[in-house]
Regions:
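Feature marking well-ordered beta-strand scaffolds used for ligand recognition
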Residues: 1-374
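Short boundary segments that mark the start of a structured unit
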Residues: 368-568
């Protein structure tokens, strides 16, 4: 009842951090649309707005964010699919946050689709991975018998089909991806570039791995199956890969309901991409159906329907251990389609989002990463850097009550408005702590000098991953590097390049917009000049100044008086 649209149920969920402000948002699918909720203050979430849609039990949502150098600001769009109703692909403009959201279009490349996915992005920031081009996959749609197919996000306000974009064989229910950079890219993907993009196709009765590095020339790599339950009792539903890209966790939506199993997650090794092989299995304490899951560090966050959220320790991926759960559906733990539909564990704050079919949005604090070997992370979520300096970043081994094991964590830089090899020198690697060592470890990054003195403030990011030996990722596993520079106050422009007015209309209002940043007070002067219409004869002379205060991003108007004369 707290949602403005008064939905009767909820479904899937995704998250978004606005890199202009650092504010965090939940995007939750509802029976009658998609709601965007500000969760920056997790104890006081507030709905920003809802984009309405036709009634459906199934919606899926993903977000793409990128830096627009033309306006000096981050831009973001959400893409929502719907199944069972003809409501197309809903594209949502997130660029008026925190004040509002708006509908860009109902894109008609398909009439409906069960799921949507975006490859080659970081799932916390929803930005492109270094050196890779994101593409959007529509999954389980009314086209191509439901097989997944891809679209370009070069113009993110719409979906542009990629040539030969029909991939797969048979209906794809859900998908995930990973980028392979080790020897498998050469020996198994036969890819000449730096990485191989593997799409994981959950295909109802099997899991298929596809090489989609060239999205117009997709090739099947291998197929994974299992036989502990009859095919008639299987539904290969969804899954996710580990951060080391060696294992996939697979969810079957029917084996609890139809084969009488307790919650069962199967683990496949993909050491050989051409032959995925089951190497482990997690069996839960209840009959609740496992639905969707996501990896963060050595934790697996799983929406477990009537059990709510289940969290597994996957330090040993083949032998997961149940380390926590939060019950969003208290009446029972049966094999029914009630309770937690989706989860999103990637917010920079470390908070976890859960969507429950009957009770809505949950924002949870993660208490499952406590470990005697410590939590590995940054002390803050952001730090400042100067042009031309060598920046030293400390990484902590915190809360280690009995640090008897050697532990490690990997690090990688992600470009933002600051670009690698232009604004900073990219580095990556592994930080190591010997047994009983809790001293900070350091990462050094060379920041390029500003030769002109004209560069704007910029930012890029450091990401931690793959903690070892039961050490976990702390809440601050992402660090924003804010590089000093000139303040970007946005750009000023007319909202339209031209407009038409009747001579007898009397006057016309011309609208100006402040795009991008709203930091600082800005102004623009204007003056009319003659064209085919003459100032003084056809239009009254006008000049002046339009002003915006610090933080003001509202549209402004200039009123121009038209002279109604008798001349042609």
């Amino acid at each position: 009842n707290e949602f403005s649209s008064r939905p009767s149920a909820a479904n899937d969920i995704w998250g978004h951090v606005d890199l202009n402000t650092g504010d965090e948002y939940a995007l939750i699918g509802l029976r009658n649309g998609v709601a965007v909720v500000n969760v920056t203050d997790p104890e006081n979430p507030s709905e920003v707005g809802t984009i309405s849609g036709l009634s459906s039990s199934w919606r899926d949502i993903k977000v793409y964010q990128y830096f627009d150098s033309g306006i000096g600001a981050w831009q973001a769009y959400a893409y929502a699919t719907i199944d069972s109703s003809t409501d197309y692909v809903t594209i949502i403009n997130l660029n008026q946050l925190p004040n509002s959201v708006s509908l860009v279009e109902k894109n008609r490349v398909v009439t409906k689709a069960h799921n949507v996915y975006i490859t080659n992005v970081d799932h916390t920031l929803n930005i492109a991975l270094p050196g890779l081009t994101p593409s959007l996959q529509l999954i389980g749609s009314n086209r191509f018998s439901g097989a997944f197919h891809s679209y370009s996000l070069k113009s993110p306000e719409t979906l542009t089909a990629i040539s030969n974009n029909y991939f797969g064989s048979g209906y794809t229910h859900d998908g995930a991806s990973m980028n392979i950079t080790d020897s498998r890219k050469d020996s198994q993907c036969n890819t000449s570039g730096d990485s191989c993009t593997v799409f994981i196709d959950f295909n109802e009765k099997e899991m298929k791995l596809w090489n989609i590095t060239d999205t117009s020339d997709t090739k099947l790599l291998g197929t994974g199956e299992y036989d502990d339950v009859a095919k008639s009792n299987q539904y290969v539903h969804s899954g996710w890969g580990t951060e080391d890209k060696q294992h996939i966790f697979l969810h079957d939506e029917f084996d609890e309901k139809d084969a009488g199993l307790n919650s069962t997650v199967r683990i496949f090794s993909i050491a050989d991409l051409t032959n995925p092989t089951q190497v482990g299995q997690w069996t839960g304490p209840t009959r609740a159906i496992d639905h969707n899951g996501f990896v963060r560090g050595n934790r697996y966050y799983m929406s477990n329907y009537e059990r709510g959220l289940t969290v597994l320790d996957i330090t040993d991926p083949a032998n997961p251990v149940d380390v926590g759960f939060f019950d969003t559906y208290t009446p029972s733990n049966n094999a029914g389609f009630n309770g937690a539909w989706g989860t999103y564990p990637y917010l920079p704050s470390g908070n976890i989002l859960v969507s429950d079919i009957g009770s809505g949005l949950y924002i949870l604090k993660d208490r499952t990463h406590e470990s005697s070997q410590g939590k590995l992370g940054f002390s803050n979520r952001a730090i400042n850097a100067n042009q031309g300096e060598t920046l030293t970043i400390n990484v902590q081994r915190d809360s280690a009550s009995n640090p008897t094991e050697a532990v490690s964590v990997n690090y990688q830089l992600l470009p933002g408005s600051a670009k690698e090899n232009t604004d900073y020198t990219p580095v990556s690697g592994t930080l190591n702590w010997p047994a009983n060592d809790t001293a900070d470890k350091t990462i050094e990054i060379d920041i390029a000098a500003d030769a002109t003195g004209e560069e704007f403030k910029e930012k890029f990011f450091v990401r931690l991953s793959q903690p070892s030996n039961t050490a976990t990722l702390g809440s601050n596993s992402y660090l924003t590097i804010d590089v000093a520079g000139r303040v970007n106050s946005g750009t000023l422009a007319f909202t339209s390049a031209e407009t038409t007015v009747a001579e007898n209309q009397g006057s016309i209002d011309i609208t100006l917009a402040r795009q991008g940043s709203s930091i600082g007070a800005v102004s623009a002067s204007y003056l009319l000049s003659s064209g085919t219409a003459t100032v003084g004869d056809d239009v009254e002379s006008a000049s002046g100044t339009v002003e915006w205060a610090d933080g003001d991003a509202s549209e402004k108007t200039i009123s121009i008086d038209i002279i109604n004369d008798t001349d042609d």
